[in-house]
Amino acid sequence: MSLTDRTKPTDVSLNTDLYELTMAQGFWESGLVDTQATFNAFFRENPFGGGYAVACGMGQIPDLVENFVFDDEDIEYLASIPAPGGGSMFKPEFLEYLRNHHLDLTIHAVPEGDVVFPREPMVRVQGPLIDCQLIETALLNLVNFQTLVATKTSRVVRAAEGHPVSDFGLRRAQGPDGGLAVARASYIAGASSTSNLLAGKIYGIPVFGTHAHSWVMAFPTELDAFRAFAKSSPKNCVLLLDTYDVHQGIKNAITVAKEMEAAGERLAAIRIDSGDLAKLTKETRRAFDDAGLPYVKISASNDLDEYTIQSLYA
């Protein structure tokens, strides 16, 4: 499965380590720029102590190659970097070479979502030595992080045993780009949706959300908050139970669910975001079943990993 960017990346040529450019200048000075080379991207150990990894990020490599050019601002910045002994780190002639340079590479990669193992190539880059070197860091930046996220998501999805998993990770992600990468990789690895609207817009990932504790705290009582949310979102009403007390939240949610039934609607689900999730989700399931509401789904969030999720079904 491959999700292609619907936006054009910017500044990709400088999204690299300094030493890629110093080596490139050295190859240029040594007459090696056209020497043919092959670079293989692989990893040495499976992440998370597991038995496999899930490849991801490869679908964005074509855009990376296409947009990997040094514009005037890039050249100006590179010219401004001082050498330790004085002067500029990069020779004007080399910078002029970069200004007019376009990558000429052949790239083979395993499909995104495929299971991969240590010490086998995930991506093979072939072409002029200088091109292989220039793109190395940016390519690894795409593939390594998304493969890590996809692998973790795959483990979580397997632990969920067919129950839907949604990406709510934006607020803890490593910046805006990190949030997009997480949403993309999670979806490729089996997550059913994301809370990240920008990821939904760019990649076409289904979006999903509930409401926050702040919603409940904005009303005089929890019951008032639940009723207001049911009125505002009757077709996709998911109530968060643990703002104050989960057990009281269960009672209030059941009250609202019955009121929704009387109005011809149905409470879609409830969410629990804290406490002993394994214990509380089971108690909640029993309470809703006993109230004649077996269709109400139970959603859990907050610090969930594959081991916590396994405990929910134990």
Please identify what each model-predicted range represents:
Residues 1-235, 262, 266:
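Ordered alpha/beta subdomains of enzyme catalytic regions
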Residues 214-314:
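Glycine-rich phosphate/ribose-binding loops and adjacent secondary-structure elements
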